[in-house]
């Protein structure tokens, strides 16, 4: 279930079966019809979306921060074209949003921007099966665009493009929502202006590059030529293709794989980096913020020195407009995210819960709290016998006790998360809201996978033995 959503299976299937769309539907049905658990990190994202409209646990008010101060307040409130940067370009890789806005201006496009009214496009919620939140986000963004008189939505992120071009209209039809928007990737807009002789780049860059076709814009959207036309219009730049390109292009390893299985995602990313390096290119050019994060993370972990450069960033360099390299900040933010992913694995969560055993026992209602104290204080043979009697009962009892215990344990849990994960200030400030909301959804469904790992810790604690792996870092 934790695939990359790259759709290569659809291309390779000799029976032309809709494999990836079927997986997409299955995830939603498993969660909404069978009450299954989604990939745990998506519950943190969902809590952030509900509170601040983004997946990075940043503040909604800070979404426009990517925009240079001299540009803020300069865009029209209403326009037929809107620029939709998406979460990662807005909060992590600012160069993408800054460069795209500059290129649209250079192309003569008058555009508006939702600012702090922009929400995540919602695709993380859709692919993880959290369709109720996906629908909320869809309605929010569509209404926000309508309020500004928008007819065309221009995106940086290929996933955002896929949402506005394909997924929103499909769901709007099912939900009875009026939907009239055209969607374009910025490279299509700029390529059209270049072809019409209305736009050109005047700074030669003198470099050899290769191009990574994003799955959501490539295989899913068939946008192959516009990005290449932009690259080929830059003086001094030589484009060399990777072995697997266009429809056959290999995925970077992001989306569900990156969240559910980071080591597998890193291996997939390394394969793409090796293919790029084999071309002799001096840089790998991409146009997907999430691809770029994933490729940067894979390069960092594998020791690959090939620079990952966003296409808009490259094009702005060719226009004489410089933007900062986001690599260091992107790696730091991914480190926070990966820390949360690792903490939410069942075995890690069991160890984390074990570190909170004193608080958990004190949070138990009577008579269970007293029973735990009695077991811990009993002499060896009697204690061991009582523990043996408890062990088969706890998997059934613990899920019933936990909802009442969580509010009392939450302060210690928040402190433990803060000790384990070096969060940015805005994320740490929001954790008292985000973590309880996520745990309310997670724990009832996650406990069956956690309890087998947790019980040995609990038994060791009651016997007065050190429970390895429970120390707070």
Indicate residue ranges for each PLM-predicted region.
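Iron-sulfur-cluster electron-transfer modules
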Residues: 1-172, 332-348, 352-360
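Conserved hydrophobic helix-helix packing surfaces used for dimerization/oligomerization
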Residues: 81-83, 209, 284
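A polyampholytic, Gly/Pro-enriched intrinsically disordered region
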Residues: 132-137, 198-213, 258-268, 325-344
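Short, flexible loop segments at boundaries between secondary-structure elements
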Residues: 175-203, 244-247, 300-338
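A short, acidic, amphipathic alpha-helical segment used as a generic capping/interface helix at domain edges
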Residues: 263-282
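Amphipathic, rod-like alpha-helical scaffolds used for oligomerization/assembly
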Residues: 344, 348-470
